[in-house]
Amino acid sequence: MSQGHGTDDVAAGLGVPERTGQRFAELVAVMDRLRSPGGCAWDGQQTHESLVRYLVEEAYEVVEAVEAEGGPAAHAGLLVEELGDVLLQVVFHSRVAQERPRAEGGFDVADVLEAITAKLVRRHPHVFGDSTASTPAEVEEQWAQIKAQERADRAARREA
């Protein structure tokens, strides 16, 4: 995190509508029910590997909705649906992983949210820290430098 700007600090200042959190919690609860005993037989049998094709298909369907004649504004309902399908895949994969012990690579959707939030804050020090980048080109350059450093740090951790 950049100069004391943690994700909790950032979230506190964002004013995320309560409705957003409620809807997300509902989605997670529905997936929990689908994967639980007495839930859906098909959903309960899925693995990361079996779900990959659906994630790819849904991502392509988002692209199609964006590129459709008239653009995303003309097809907002379709785009909402397709983005929901991609979000479902994130929640689904997270739920599958949650069923595994943490020591064996398990995680939950809160871990995914924490990781992406931290990454966005870390890669935007011009917004959340003391760095400056006022043009899109400067932002892209800074982003590339931060991403390269993250790769180097990951490689060093693997070698350790």
What annotation goes with each model-predicted range?
Residues 1-83, 88-160:
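Flexible "arm" and connector segments at domain edges
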